């Protein structure tokens, strides 16, 4: 996910500046109401929960108090910009089911499954659960062996379903979004969120 050359880095900086500029036309109250963030008017600051940490965003510059990955930061700004307050029905969808997700989203669904198979290889269930928990996940009962819901952004949970290895099959996993995801991020940003989750999972396993 890290950009390697200067042209691409410049493109990233332009996207960042454009995102901040759009947000500066909006009030903190409005952004909070639509995104699920908390606005502290006395400090002119937004507070956003992402994974296991609370990120403070200082208005009007939109500086943050965290050393999160730059793409995580840009996605957070895009989320604040696009959020319209739509409630979800808890129905899960794949990335390919996103609006405009047919090509990019479907490709990510396949890539994520391949990466998860490698990531989960030789990991025991307890270790997998611990890695998810360390990223702030909550667990729900489903037909999968493990279902972890990650609080990636206030109204943008990401669900990871895992089937543990048995005698016939290796461990496998799939990532899902909720059916209102299109109201909060574009398919490009959704894929970035998925990549961030995979990266964080990889780091969480390494630190156990």
Residue ranges of predicted features:
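A recognition module on extended beta-rich or small alphabeta surfaces enriched in W/G with H and D/E
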Residues: 178-208
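Short Lys/Arg-enriched alpha/beta "domain-start" segment
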Residues: 1-43, 72, 80-138
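Short, charged/polar micro-motifs that form catalytic or ligand-binding hotspots
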Residues: 66, 114, 118-121, 146, ...
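Short, hydrophobic/amphipathic alpha-helical patches that form generic packing surfaces
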Residues: 70-85, 192-200
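Intrinsically disordered, low-complexity regulatory segments enriched in Ser/Thr/Pro
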Residues: 52-78, 163-188
